[in-house]
Swiss-Prot record:
S-adenosyl-L-methionine binds at N27, L29, G54, E75, D95, N118. GO terms for cellular component: cytosol. Its EC number is 2.1.1.182. It comes from the Bacteria. Belongs to the class I-like SAM-binding methyltransferase superfamily. rRNA adenine N(6)-methyltransferase family. RsmA subfamily. Pfam families: RrnaAD. Coiled coil: none annotated. It comes from Chlamydia caviae (strain ATCC VR-813 / DSM 19441 / 03DC25 / GPIC) (Chlamydophila caviae). Keywords: Cytoplasm, Methyltransferase, RNA-binding, rRNA processing, S-adenosyl-L-methionine, Transferase. Specifically dimethylates two adjacent adenosines (A1518 and A1519) in the loop of a conserved hairpin near the 3'-end of 16S rRNA in the 30S particle. May play a critical role in biogenesis of 30S subunits. It catalyses: adenosine(1518)/adenosine(1519) in 16S rRNA + 4 S-adenosyl-L-methionine = N(6)-dimethyladenosine(1518)/N(6)-dimethyladenosine(1519) in 16S rRNA + 4 S-adenosyl-L-homocysteine + 4 H(+). InterPro entries: KsgA/Erm, rRNA_Ade_diMease-like_C, rRNA_Ade_Mease_Trfase_CS, rRNA_Ade_methylase_Trfase_N, rRNA_adenine_dimethylase, SAM-dependent_MTases_sf. This is Ribosomal RNA small subunit methyltransferase A.
Length: 278
């Protein structure tokens, strides 16, 4: 019987006298069709190595293993340690937010891997940020389940209220695609929100050299930190307002431009202009 079976999960929880922990965002996938769709979207092939964060009872883990992937799983809850050890995976009982991802290569995981995970929703943003800040060149693809609201934010287009610094951050590193929506009924227990799967194809080369990443993201964070402000006002602690006005004019934007107006490429152009004239 598959680990996506509700009966199997219920039986396991009864055996260990456990229950899903709300504080760890434990909502377990119990829909085999959704698992197969995640696998198809992820592009995982036999022989790939895959990082899974928060495997829980192991429904997605099992699907990845059956596909022939070599799975590295980071699970915080020791309740699942013994059952996950029954699968042929490299398991770490650890807090993924604190786990040094550079250790993966040190432990022998050579070449680019993939990330496939049903992310704990309360730490989705920190985990996505960590993946690309710590080891951006480690990944071929990142395929993750998250809250639908967050999925729409990170796949938003310029001009909308959902578009923000996280959108730009992820699009800097990857081509980001909203794959499909997942209803609450596909989980146990049912979450109070809809979910979605997002697929990211990581770029071979990034728009800026590594030494400039933090400076660029400081600009975009400042821009969206007070999104009701004009862009020049939002950046006043980083650059003189007149310098921002001049750069915007060179890009054919008005002085009244707001942060959500600029695309990733336009923010990169703005950054180059501001850096060269600062």
């Amino acid at each position: 019987m598959s680990r996506s079976s509700p009966d199997q999960l219920t039986r396991f929880l009864a055996q260990v006298q456990g229950r899903p922990k709300k504080g760890l965002s434990q909502n377990f996938l119990i829909d085999g069709n959704i698992l197969r769709k995640i696998l198809a979207v992820s592009c995982v092939e036999a022989g790939d190595w895959v990082l899974e964060i928060g495997p829980g009872f192991g429904a997605l883990t099992e699907v990845l293993v059956n596909q022939g992937a070599h799975v590295v799983a980071l699970e915080k809850d020791p309740m699942f340690e013994e059952t996950l050890k029954q699968l042929p995976i490299d398991l770490e009982i650890t807090d993924a937010c604190k786990y040094p991802l550079s250790q993966l290569e040190e432990k022998g995981w050579q070449g680019k891997g993939r990330v496939v995970a049903n992310l704990p929703y309360h730490i989705t943003t920190p985990l996505l940020t960590k993946l690309f800040l710590e080891v951006p060149n480690q990944w071929k693809t990142v395929t993750v389940m998250m809250q639908d609201e967050v999925a729409r934010r990170i796949t938003a287009q310029p001009g909308g209220k959902e578009y923000g610094s996280l959108t730009i951050f992820l699009q800097f590193f990857a081509d980001v695609r909203y794959a499909f929506k997942v209803s609450p009924g596909c989980f146990f227990p049912k979450p109070q929100v809809s979910s979605a799967v997002v697929h990211m194809t990581v770029k071979e080369t990034f728009p800026l050299e590594t030494s400039l990443h933090q400076k660029f993201f400081s600009l975009t964070r400042a821009a969206f930190g007070q999104r009701r402000k004009l862009l020049a006002n939002a950046l006043k602690d980083l650059y003189p307002k007149e310098l921002v006005f001049s750069a915007l004019n060179q890009l054919n934007f008005s002085e009244k431009t707001r942060p959500e107006t600029l695309s990733l490429n336009e923010y990169l152009q703005l950054f180059h202009l501001l850096s060269s004239n600062a």
